[in-house]
C-alpha cells in the first residue's frame, strides 16, 4: 500500500506540474503581444479550444469529486482567459475573435444545458460528460496534424515548438497513467493521441532540425 500510495502521489504530482507547465507555455505569446502590441505570429484558436477543454474537464472533475482535475483545470482556464483577453485587446479584428469565442462558448453552454437538464441521472451524466471531454481532447491533439503535413512539405520545423512538444508528451503520459491508476478510460484514451503526435513531432525535429533551417536562411541572405 505504501509503495502504491507513493506511486499515486508521484503520478498526481506529475500531472499537476507538467500540465501547468504546458498551460504556461502561452506566457511567451502573452509577453510577445505585450512587447509588440500586436498578435502577429500568435494563433487564437488554441487559446479558445484549450479554454473550452479546461471548462469541460473542470465540470467533469467537479461532478466526479476529483480534486486534481479541479485544481489543474481551474488554473488552466484562468490562464487561457488571460491569453484570450490579451489577444482581444491587441487584435485589430475584434469582431472575428468575438464571434469565434461566442460560438464555441455557446456550444459549451448548450452542452451544459443538455447534461444538467436532460440527463437527470448523475452517473449517466458523468459518463456522457466524460465522453464529450474525451472526444474534444482527442480532436485538440489531432488538430495540429495539418501543421505536421506543412512541416513535411516545407522540410522546416520552424513552426513547431520543441519545449511545448516535451511538455505535451510528459503531460499526456502522466494523464494516461493517472487514468490507468484510477480506471478512468476517458482520461487515459483521450491523452494517448498526445503521446503519438508528440513522438511524430520528435521525429520531425530529428528529420528537419531547426539549426539546419537557420543555416539555410543565412546562406540565402
From Swiss-Prot:
What does the record give as the function of this protein?
Mediates sugar transport across membranes. May stimulate V(D)J recombination by the activation of RAG1.
Q: Which PANTHER family match?
A: RAG1-ACTIVATING PROTEIN 1 (PTHR10791), SUGAR TRANSPORTER SWEET1 (PTHR10791:SF30)
Q: What is this protein called?
A: Sugar transporter SWEET1
Report membrane topology. Multi-pass membrane protein
Coiled-coil intervals, chain numbering: none
Q: Which GO terms describe its molecular function?
A: sugar transmembrane transporter activity
State if Membrane is listed as a keyword: yes
Q: How does it assemble?
A: Interacts with TRPV2; the interaction probably occurs intracellularly and depends on TRPV2 N-glycosylation.
> Where are the stretches annotated Mediates interaction with TRPV2?
149-221
**Subcellular location(s) per record:** Golgi apparatus membrane; Cell membrane
Q: Which GO cellular component does the record give, naming just one?
A: endomembrane system
- Which Cys pairs are S-S linked? none
- Major localization class: Golgi
- Which ranges does the record mark as transmembrane? 3-23, 42-62, 68-88, 96-116, 126-146, 160-180, 186-206
Q: Which UniProt keywords apply?
A: Cell membrane, Golgi apparatus, Membrane, Repeat, Sugar transport, Transmembrane, Transmembrane helix, Transport
The chain positions of domain MtN3/slv read: 10-94, 127-212
Family listed: Belongs to the SWEET sugar transporter family.
Query: What gene makes this protein?
Result: SLC50A1
Amino acid at each position: 500500500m505504501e509503495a502504491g500510495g507513493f506511486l499515486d502521489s508521484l503520478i498526481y504530482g506529475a500531472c499537476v506540474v507538467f500540465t501547468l507547465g504546458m498551460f504556461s507555455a502561452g506566457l511567451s505569446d502573452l509577453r510577445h503581444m505585450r512587447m509588440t502590441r500586436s498578435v502577429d505570429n500568435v494563433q487564437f484558436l488554441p487559446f479558445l479550444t484549450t479554454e473550452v477543454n479546461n471548462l469541460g474537464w473542470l465540470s467533469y472533475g467537479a461532478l466526479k469529486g476529483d480534486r486534481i482535475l479541479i485544481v489543474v483545470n481551474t488554473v488552466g482556464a484562468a490562464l487561457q482567459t488571460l491569453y484570450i483577453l490579451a489577444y482581444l485587446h491587441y487584435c485589430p479584428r475584434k469582431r472575428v475573435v468575438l464571434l469565434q469565442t461566442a460560438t464555441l462558448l455557446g456550444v459549451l453552454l448548450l452542452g451544459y444545458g443538455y447534461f444538467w437538464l436532460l440527463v437527470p441521472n448523475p452517473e449517466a451524466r458523468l459518463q456522457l460528460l466524460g465522453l464529450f471531454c474525451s472526444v474534444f481532447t482527442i480532436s485538440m491533439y489531432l488538430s495540429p496534424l495539418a501543421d505536421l503535413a506543412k512541416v513535411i512539405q516545407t522540410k522546416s520545423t520552424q513552426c513547431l515548438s520543441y519545449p511545448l512538444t516535451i511538455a505535451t508528451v510528459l503531460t499526456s503520459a502522466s494523464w494516461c497513467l493517472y487514468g490507468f491508476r484510477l480506471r478512468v478510460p476517458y482520461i487515459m484514451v483521450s491523452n494517448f493521441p498526445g503521446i503519438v503526435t508528440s513522438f511524430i513531432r520528435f521525429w520531425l525535429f530529428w528529420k528537419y532540425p531547426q539549426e539546419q533551417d537557420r543555416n539555410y536562411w543565412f546562406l540565402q541572405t
